Amino acid sequence: MKDRIERAAAFIKQNLPESPKIGLILGSGLGILADEIENPVKLKYEDIPEFPVSTVEGHAGQLVLGTLEGVSVIAMQGRFHFYEGYSMEKVTFPVRVMKALGVEALIVTNAAGGVNTEFRAGDLMIITDHINFMGTNPLIGPNEADFGARFPDMSSAYDKDLSSLAEKIAKDLNIPIQKGVYTAVTGPSYETPAEVRFLRTMGSDAVGMSTVPEVIVANHAGMRVLGISCISNAAAGILDQPLSHDEVMEVTEKVKAGFLKLVKAIVAQYE
């Protein structure tokens, strides 16, 4: 895997004016943030050696390199999901490449179902912790000592200082913000009402089909992580209506202004 990471990183470096400090993974409907990047260099995933290709609506499938609020960044406009048939190694491959390019911190975003009955569609939630309900882990297999420890600590998977900064900025900008625990499931079927009741009993506030694999690998690699969920719908059983991906896209479209302001301000104040 090391050789493949180096090949991808070498190709991307040819297009990099400077080493990026922050990596951004933009979830369903949230790729609009990449359009805010100044002096952008756009690389389609299919043109990058060893990169998988995104197949989900709302995911553009390209890397965008440049500056955001004066900070050098690299953004994934579209991520890879386990349910698409990719191995966990491929799902998390871009995080390894970001680390090889010099990224210090990862801001990972997603659209998620609200498990907490106090949450409403359109809320933004700072992820304080997660539950891995995917039945697997991206670190299974031989450990590359150069990448990180065999048994990485996950007691502070989400950087407390970055989370506090995000909360403070949201309050300063009058952007309503929630905090909570995100649960990752494999999908692609949405959860049943019984599963959602179970997740709520376990202490989950939101549920989705991504994020946790990337966060585990980022922690393994020694990167700081900030996670933000857009609560795109109430999870199954809370409202008397079926769930759809179209609904997810509609809600993320409505919250994009607040989301953009929040993430740009976080990047601007990153230290």
Swiss-Prot record:
One of its GO terms (molecular function) is purine-nucleoside phosphorylase activity. Coiled coil: none annotated. The modification Phosphoserine is found at S28. GO terms for cellular component: cytoplasm. The gene is punA. This is Purine nucleoside phosphorylase 1. It comes from Bacillus subtilis (strain 168). One of its GO terms (biological process) is nucleoside metabolic process. Phosphate binds at S28, H59, R79, F80, H81, A111, S210.
